Amino acid sequence: MAGENPTASEYIQHHLQNLTFGNHPEHGWSFAHTAQEAKEMGFWAVHVDSLGWSIALGALFVWLFRKAAVKATSGVPSGLQNFVEIMVDFVDKSVKETFHGKNAVIAPLALTVFCWIFLMNLMDLVPVDFLPRLFQVITGDDHAYFKVVPTTDVNVTLGMSLSVFFLIIYYSIKVKGVGGFLGELTLQPFGKWMLPFNLLLEGVGLIAKPISLALRLFGNLYAGELLFILIALMPFWAQWALSVPWAIFHILVIVLQAFIFMMLTIVYLSMAHEDH
């Protein structure tokens, strides 16, 4: 938004708007130039920035861990190898303490979830104007939208939580069978005579799992990003006085939210493997 003096409201709205590509009723397939155009593109519009950054950070995770694995030695680890081993040991210990079934997929899944979400959350520490302004310079569009924190997009967090939800359903049916899975939904906690009430109660609890996973991660990171944006509106001296302490505190939020998402994923999948 160079060349203008936007109001505080316009500045905030601009930073919270995604780079959106979709089929506009009037302009056809194109990038949205306003928030209204993005809204008019409907459900099938794509948030290009969220998608791009999430894929790029996922690829970075794979590259870093593959590099550490290729260069791993039997001696005392150092540098990247040491960091990767600490992460693997931490996640492996968390899985062993929490997951009570037998499934070789759970530990790699938990490691992927934790590291991927951590990297996406970490983008919140990049100065709020740096990458968006760089993108505007590269594209030559001073009004271009560009969000760099994928987990501040509810579509990303909901997509991840739905993936966990489908795994819960899959393993519940695989371990307990269709009858056992349906029995959990209809025969608990009050027996067969209260089947409709059981289904309502258990169904709501099941659906609440992915929704709570998604909204918890989204809400915390969205609030953090909003505070960074508000700090950026302050005088230069105030930005330094407030942004550094908030960034230090926000590091805890970044790690904690990745850890919570990982642990709840392990817990939910452990429950799916319990055959009563």
Swiss-Prot record:
Pfam families: ATP-synt_A. It is found in: Cell inner membrane. One of its GO terms (cellular component) is plasma membrane. GO terms for molecular function: proton-transporting ATP synthase activity, rotational mechanism. Its main location: membrane. GO terms for biological process: proton motive force-driven plasma membrane ATP synthesis. It comes from the Bacteria. It is a multi-pass membrane protein. Keywords: ATP synthesis, Cell inner membrane, Cell membrane, CF(0), Hydrogen ion transport, Ion transport, Membrane, Transmembrane, Transmembrane helix, Transport. Belongs to the ATPase A chain family. Key component of the proton channel; it plays a direct role in the translocation of protons across the membrane. F-type ATPases have 2 components, CF(1) - the catalytic core - and CF(0) - the membrane proton channel. CF(1) has five subunits: alpha(3), beta(3), gamma(1), delta(1), epsilon(1). CF(0) has three main subunits: a(1), b(2) and c(9-12). The alpha and beta chains form an alternating ring which encloses part of the gamma chain. CF(1) is attached to CF(0) by a central stalk formed by the gamma and epsilon chains, while a peripheral stalk is formed by the delta and b chains. This is ATP synthase subunit a 2. It comes from Hahella chejuensis (strain KCTC 2396). The gene is atpB2.
